[in-house]
Amino acid sequence: VRFSTHPTCFGNEVLGLLKNYPVSMIELGVSSLDNEVLEQCRRGYAASDVITVIQALLKLKYNVGAQLMIGLPHQTEESTFSDLETLASISGDSSLTLRIYPCLVLKNTQLEKLLLKGEYKPLSIENAVRWSGKVHRRAIDLGFKIQRIGLHETPSLNNSVIAGPHHPSLGEMARAFSLILDITGNDPSGPWKIPRRNISMLQGHNNFGIRSLADISGFSVQEIKAKISYI
């Protein structure tokens, strides 16, 4: 059994019931551990509530997943990095899996009302790719497993989204940006030797990875191509 649920759905009674079932993974819709963000999003819990639930589940030896979001009202990149640090500190040697989702504006929601009133500005696809790529890189460095970046495409989702970074390849581009951060972090100016398995990650989507590497390193696209060798 594998399931995803709201962090407030766990009490001692529920935890006791779970012992009777072969649960392989419990995922929590954490969204954020920034209390201001949680309050603005009306999530109905505080960061301390999430931490308590995760610690209880890990103590019972469950595999736990945390679903984090980017681009929420009043959220910053720094707060998401702080979320990762907090999760790393409470997970210890236990396995904790992450999903990273962008905030999208759906029809007939409170967020749509904020958008129409000019009180919320969704992320662009480019900013969402960069933000989630940074989160991915930091999460990997902290030892997390990343199960997914971006939402699974469904007809109902496609028909409901009215604004925000909705792109079927958001995850692939975010991982490409994460790779670029790793490459330039180890060697800012190259030349770089890159595994062949990453060719599509760099060259896909109109050379998104190559262009990102050029942007970060300050070299032209042609100079970047000359500095890369695939092994």
Q: Language-model features: where?
A:
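Generic structural motif
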Residues: H6-T8, C103, R197, I224
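Short secondary-structure boundary segments
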Residues: V30, P102, I194-R196
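Histidine- and/or cysteine-centered catalytic micro-motif in compact active-site loops
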Residues: Y101-C103, L151-H152
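Auxiliary Fe-S-binding modules of radical SAM enzymes
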Residues: Q110, K117-I231
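Conserved non-cysteine loop/helix-boundary elements of the Radical SAM core domain that shape
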Residues: V1-K61, G65, M69-I100, K107-E126
